[in-house]
Regions:
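Basic, flexible linker segments flanking DNA-binding modules
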Residues: 1-53, 147, 202-211
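Hydrophobic beta-strand scaffold residues
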Residues: 22, 139-140
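C-terminal domain-tail junction helix/linker
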Residues: 136, 160-222
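RNase H-like two-metal-ion nuclease catalytic core shared by retroviral integrases
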Residues: 31-35, 120-122, 128-130, 142-162, ...
C-alpha cells in the first residue's frame, strides 16, 4: 500500500525469520450442483467483473464449513464494484430459504435505484421459484454448466476466508463458526483488508471514495 515492491522469495525469507507459516487452501468441494441446464438461463454477466458503480452487479454463492458437529453452510452476496460482502447467512442446511434470507438482507441494506444484475451458479437454490420471486426486479445471470470461473470473484472470496482465517481453527459448532465469520467480515474483510481491485483500499473505503467523488461531480454539474 505504501508502494514498496519486494519479491515473493524475500517475503518467504521474512516469514521464516518471523516464524510465520503460509496458509494453504484445502481441496475444493462442491456444495451446489448444477440442477438446471436450460439454455434459458443466460450468462448475462459474461465474466465482466468490474462494474463502474455500486449495485450494478451482485454475485452469490454457497460454501461449506467443517465443524466438529457437522458441516454448516455460508451463503454470501458480493457487490462486484467494491468486492464488499453486502450480506451473508450461516445455516445448518442447504435449503433455498438461506439464499432468500441473504437476498432480503442485501436488499434492505443497499439502495437499488438502477438496473441490477445478480449472478450465481445453476444450483437448485438459485433456480427455485422462491429465488426467482425474491429477485423479480433484478436481471438474473447464471454461470455456464460446470464452469465455476464464471463466478470467480465470490468463489475466490470463499477460498480466502477459509485460507486466511477459518482453517486456523478447529471449529466446534455453528455458534463458533458464526462468531469467526462475523469477526472476519465485519471487523476485517469489509473494513480493513486491502484489495488490489480497490486500488489497495478496503471495500468500505473504496465505496466511500466513490460516493464522495460522485457527490462532488454532481455538485459541480449543478
Amino acid at each position: 500500500k505504501t508502494g514498496e515492491v519486494i519479491s515473493e522469495r524475500t517475503v518467504g525469507t521474512y516469514m521464516r525469520q518471523m516464524g510465520i507459516r503460509a496458509q494453504w487452501s484445502k481441496p475444493w468441494t462442491i456444495t451446489t450442483k448444477d440442477s438446471d441446464f436450460s439454455t434459458e438461463l443466460q450468462n448475462i454477466l459474461d465474466e465482466q467483473f468490474n462494474p463502474d458503480r455500486p449495485n450494478a452487479v451482485w454475485c452469490s454463492d454457497i460454501t461449506y464449513i467443517w465443524t466438529i458437529d457437522g458441516f454448516v453452510y455460508l451463503t454470501s452476496i458480493m457487490d462486484l464494484f467494491s468486492r464488499k460482502i453486502i450480506a451473508w447467512t450461516l445455516s445448518e442446511t442447504l435449503e433455498v430459504s438461506c439464499v432468500i434470507d441473504t437476498i432480503n438482507k442485501a436488499k434492505a441494506r443497499r439502495n437499488i435505484d438502477q438496473p441490477l444484475i445478480i449472478h450465481s451458479d445453476r444450483g437448485s437454490q438459485y433456480v427455485a421459484k422462491e429465488y426467482k420471486k425474491a429477485t423479480e426486479n433484478m436481471q438474473r445471470s447464471y454461470s455456464k454448466k460446470a464452469f465455476p470461473w464464471d463466478n470467480a470473484c465470490i468463489e475466490s472470496f470463499h477460498s480466502v476466508i477459509k485460507r486466511e482465517w477459518l482453517n486456523r481453527f478447529k471449529i466446534r459448532d455453528y455458534k463458533q463458526a458464526y462468531q469467526l465469520i462475523f469477526e472476519y467480515l465485519e471487523a476485517f474483510y469489509n473494513t480493513k483488508r486491502i484489495h488490489s481491485h480497490c486500488n489497495y483500499m478496503s471495500p468500505n473505503e473504496f465505496e466511500r471514495v466513490y460516493e464522495r467523488t460522485h457527490t462532488e461531480a454532481e455538485l459541480l454539474a449543478g
